[in-house]
């Protein structure tokens, strides 16, 4: 697979008077040219006896020396299995110490780690394994409550399938992680060092399947250079040091858990704690307290669950100061709770996407609370960003449009999918490569970015653009609403009208009427933004569960399809 190459040309800066939405990130600190293997060796030299990785649910407490040694033994074993530069190694597992070892082991020998989402069905996992042609797959018989038996059976039935290695637990006739480690212990590392010398920072090291809200997942090709530098800059924005302890509930199969979590900590010599195999409220709260964490990451739904739970006896979070909340739009009340309940006065908002390795914008810890509540911060070092209209023209500052990203951090393309790569990665007239994110955003005059929705989620009602996020935020401000999902529904007259799927708050004494909610929206927003159709989750033929991508984003196209179907069946719903 030939990666897309990027030019280092600096996009042409427009005249000052134009005030166009074009930004360039700081040029300091400089980019570094390190492989992930070199990064771990360097940090081990500096912080060898310092704890790096804590997994309360397995009891593991690995120092930098431990992680480096385990990954080196495993890398040696992979070489003995014939795995080399460019070969694909798959992993489907929960958060555990072995996951980190597999990641660095593959990186050390130039292999490409194919990360498989734990929420995949056996069919989806098989697609990822076969599409990327994995030679080895690391997994477990169970991941949380999920049983992997069917997937293992499907792999066994392949004529020329990958070698399956069990990370832990019952192994039956499969090779195990411990077997591979033991096979390499005591052997000379010369073979490994020779392999490491053949690895370049600009080689692909990771395939991340994007959990897009439409179509089959695509595999973003990320390089050592992408990940090492992006994780450095993330940690810098959080002011991480070797004294920090990060509690990281997000999964390692996602960039949030891997890059914003593990790698941001490793680049700064700190310690990371993965509380449980899969997200567990009680385990996360215990980890924050027991490990004296200074930071905690999470998507909004995770933090919401933590704040709704009863804190354990003697719970302490007096050292908590920072962390990142990202992955989905963040309600204001949730950010306020980070400060009020956790004391995270230095929390940071963030924006990124898999194809950009991932973080593009991140707030500083000393940005005002209001700035962190309303924006995703400013552009990261060595990145470029612009906002364009539907014709590809850069819009003035303050005008919404599609966010595009350029710079060192862009993916090398989608694995074996040149058509999709060409669709989202487009060179401008000066030859600069831009990634079209599909996200709608706006810049202010100081370079702060606000994400206002999905560019393709815009509802066009009678020729007027309507932005779902502002309607969702208004509906969520109603005391009887705990969840709001706004989509465009088909209309013969307007083309599209506003539809809203709502969840009633547990504390609500009664369900508000449709008219009450329409009036509620109209008080702050225009009448054309008031929902024409209202549906309640779990009622009137509407499922209680919302379809989500693997990273927790709502599949809005499925919700819109459901709404259209309900209307076609003439389900009794109030109409405007």
From Swiss-Prot:
GO MF term list: ATP binding; medium-chain fatty acid-CoA ligase activity
Gene Ontology CC terms, in alphabetical order: peroxisome
EC number in record: 6.2.1.-
Key words, A-Z: ATP-binding, Ligase, Nucleotide-binding, Peroxisome, Virulence
Entry annotated with the keyword ATP-binding: yes
Main location, first listed in the record: other
Pathway named in the protein's UniProt entry: Siderophore biosynthesis
Biological process annotations from GO: fatty acid metabolic process
Superkingdom assignment: Eukaryota
Binding of ATP, residues: 439, 454, 553
Job description of the protein: Acyl-CoA ligase; part of the gene cluster that mediates the biosynthesis of at least 11 siderophores, including beauverichelin A, dimerumic acid (DA), Na-dimethyl coprogen (NADC), eleutherazine B, ferricrocin (FC), fusarinine A, fusarinine C (FsC), metachelin A, mevalonolactone, rhodotorulic acid (RA) and tenellin. This cocktail of siderophores for iron metabolism is essential for virulence, and more specifically for the fungal virulence in penetrating through the host cuticle. Siderophore synthesis is also involved in conidial germination under iron-deficient conditions.
Recorded family membership: Belongs to the ATP-dependent AMP-binding enzyme family.
Name assigned to this protein: Acyl-CoA ligase sidI
Species annotation: Beauveria bassiana (strain ARSEF 2860) (White muscardine disease fungus)
Name of encoding gene: SIDI
């Amino acid at each position: 697979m030939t990666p897309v190459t990027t030019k280092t040309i600096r996009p042409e800066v427009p005249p000052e008077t134009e005030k166009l939405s074009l930004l360039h990130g700081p040029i300091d600190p400089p980019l570094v040219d390190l492989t992930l293997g070199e990064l771990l060796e360097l940090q081990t030299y500096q912080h060898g006896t310092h704890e790096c990785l804590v997994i309360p649910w397995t009891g593991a407490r690995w120092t930098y020396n431990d992680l480096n040694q385990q990954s080196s033994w495993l890398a040696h074993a992979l070489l003995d299995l014939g795995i080399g530069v460019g070969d694909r190694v798959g992993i489907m597992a929960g958060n555990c110490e072995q996951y980190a070892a597999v990641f660095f082991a593959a990186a050390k020998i130039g292999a490409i780690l194919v990360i498989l989402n734990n929420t995949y069905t056996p069919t989806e996992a098989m697609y990822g394994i076969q599409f990327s042609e994995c030679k080895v797959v690391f997994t477990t018989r169970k991941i949380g409550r999920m049983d992997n038996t069917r997937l293992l059976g499907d792999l066994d039935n392949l004529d020329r399938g990958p070698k399956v290695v069990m990370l832990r637990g019952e192994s039956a006739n499969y090779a195990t992680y411990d077997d591979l480690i033991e096979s390499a212990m005591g052997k000379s590392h010369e073979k490994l060092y020779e392999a490491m010398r053949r690895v370049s920072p600009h080689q692909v090291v990771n395939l991340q399947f994007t959990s897009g809200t439409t179509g089959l997942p695509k595999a973003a090709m990320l390089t050592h250079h992408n990940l090492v530098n992006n994780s450095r800059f993330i940690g810098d924005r959080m002011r991480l040091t070797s004294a920090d302890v990060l509690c990281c509930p997000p999964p390692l199969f996602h960039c949030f858990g891997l890059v914003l979590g593990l790698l941001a900590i490793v680049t700064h010599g700190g310690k990371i704690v993965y509380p449980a195999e899969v997200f567990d409220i009680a385990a996360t709260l215990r980890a924050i307290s027991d490990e004296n964490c200074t930071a905690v990451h999470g998507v909004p739904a995770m933090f919401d669950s933590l704040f709704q739970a009863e804190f354990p006896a003697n719970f302490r979070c007096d050292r908590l100061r920072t962390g990142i909340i990202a992955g989905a739009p963040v309600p204001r009340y949730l950010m306020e709770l980070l400060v009020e309940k956790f004391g995270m006065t230095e929390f940071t908002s963030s924006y990124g996407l898999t194809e950009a390795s991932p973080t593009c914008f991140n707030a500083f810890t000393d940005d005002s609370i209001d700035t962190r509540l309303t924006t995703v911060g400013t552009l990261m070092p060595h990145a470029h960003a612009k906002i364009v209209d539907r014709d590809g023209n850069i819009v003035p500052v303050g005008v919404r449009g599609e966010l595009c990203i350029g710079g060192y951090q862009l993916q090398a393309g989608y694995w074996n999918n040149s058509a999709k790569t060409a669709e989202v990665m487009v060179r401008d007239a000066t030859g600069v490569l831009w990634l079209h994110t599909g996200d709608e955003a706006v810049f202010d005059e100081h370079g702060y970015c606000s994400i206002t929705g999905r560019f393709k989620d815009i509802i066009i009602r009678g020729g007027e653009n309507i932005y779902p996020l502002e309607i969702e935020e208004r509906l969520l401000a109603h005391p009887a609403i705990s969840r709001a999902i706004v989509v465009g529904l088909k209309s013969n007259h307007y083309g599209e009208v506003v539809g809203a799927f709502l969840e009633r708050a547990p504390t609500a004494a009664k369900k508000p009427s449709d008219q009450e909610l329409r009036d509620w929206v109209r008080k702050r927003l225009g009448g054309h933004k008031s929902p024409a159709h209202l549906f309640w989750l779990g009622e009137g033929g509407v499922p209680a569960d919302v379809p989500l991508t693997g990273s927790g984003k709502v599949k809005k196209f499925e919700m819109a399809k459901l709404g259209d179907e309900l209307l076609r069946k003439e389900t009794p719903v109030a109409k405007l």
